[in-house]
Amino acid sequence: MNDQQQQQWAQAIENARQQAQPKPSCPQDWGATLKDAYIVQGLGLQQRPDDAVIGFKGALTNQRVQETFGTTEPALGLLFASSARPERVIQSADFTKGMIETELGFVLSRRITAPIESVSALQSCFDGICLMVELVDLNFSQFPPSLPDLIMHNAAAAQFLKGAVSPIMDPDSLTLTLESAGDTRHRGAALDVLGGQWKALHWMVNQALALGHTLLPGQVLMTGSVGSVQPLKAGDYVLTGGDLAPLIFRVV
């Protein structure tokens, strides 16, 4: 893709988002690469000047999800302030093909300006952990999308919920369980994300820095789907994980 195509496509994506249209696929003859995809994702920030980036999301960090999209690589997305749902009520009418992902979030305790060389150094950068739920919308005009298309559409990000923050504990020892109407919808081991939560965070931090993003205290990094992805259906839900505060939410 050339510069003009990148700008043009960033605008097309934003138009589709604002008009709640299916996420368009980039013309194949433009030959979009992963580098192009992240440039377009970054240009999307210019389309939303009043919508702060309050964190980052890992996508395709789970082998099962990677298989769905035919890739072996993770992807990075942005968490916008407008996507947060602190009231913990999700309107299903906001989605065309909504899905529920259960995840862990990690809260930064300091600014990071240089790549982190080791997991041990990384651990000192975070002081909080919480349960999170991400609501994605897989309303792509072509499914599954290519990896560049997924990245350009900010990894299908739509809305997210953040649980109460607890002091850092061993995240890889956690099992996340999603329940609704007395039934267990799924149960997943946090260790399944990129072979470990700290490994996932290590990749996310260094990838964000490589893309020119700023990592600031208070931002949350959501590491990717733990367990299977569930279709968005009306009901009351409870997400639990070890000693972390349960995350209770409703879909209407």
Residue ranges with predicted function:
Residues N2-G196, A234, V238, D243-V252:
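Catalytic-core "active-site belt" of small-molecule-metabolizing enzymes
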Residues Q197-L232:
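A conserved acidic, glycine/proline-rich C-terminal tail/linker
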